[in-house]
Amino acid sequence: MWSTRVKKLLLLSFNFLIISAIVSSCSIPEELQAKTIVNEFFPNFWVFVAHTIALSIIILLGIFLLWKPTKRFLAKRSELIQAEINNANEIKKQAQFLLDNAKKQKQNAELQAREIINLATNQAYRLKNDLETDAKRKANRIIENAHAEIIKQESILKRELEGRIVDVALEATSTLIQKNVAKEDHERLVNELLRNLD
């Protein structure tokens, strides 16, 4: 785009130079005559050759001093821009690669977090069940021990009660023997003893 624009500008400036050189070499006299118009308006051959050589030199200088350095500069600039574009594309690929890796790592981390949460939840449920089972076992053991203690205490109380009953019966028998009590008195005495036991 720049090269065509530069070429057009160079051609336009060279055309302007040619026209100005031709016009400047001609002088219009004060008196215009047919002979003088042709001779004065159009330059003679040597002037034309000198102007053509000068124009050629100017064109060559323009090509070598303006157009070629500009073309080289634009080519270098184009290469630099292309290198920057390639570099940017490479950086973009690397960034995309890193982004993909980061996404994979994030997914792996989320998966590991879910697994850890599930494992912790399962361990918590297992621990809860173990604690409940242990607590039930201890409670059952305490209840069994309490039942055993109750049975033991009952048997002790029964033995004591039986011992008392025997003592009371012996006492009653000895009292009956001593008193020769009537049947009604005997029943009343037994009922009294039973009330005392309660």
Curated annotation (Swiss-Prot):
SUPFAM superfamilies: F1F0 ATP synthase subunit B, membrane domain. A lipid is attached at C26 (S-diacylglycerol cysteine). Disulfide bonds: none annotated. The chain crosses the membrane at residues 45-65. It is found in: Cell membrane. F-type ATPases have 2 components, F(1) - the catalytic core - and F(0) - the membrane proton channel. F(1) has five subunits: alpha(3), beta(3), gamma(1), delta(1), epsilon(1). F(0) has three main subunits: a(1), b(2) and c(10-14). The alpha and beta chains form an alternating ring which encloses part of the gamma chain. F(1) is attached to F(0) by a central stalk formed by the gamma and epsilon chains, while a peripheral stalk is formed by the delta and b chains. This is ATP synthase subunit b. It comes from Mycoplasmoides gallisepticum (strain R(low / passage 15 / clone 2)).
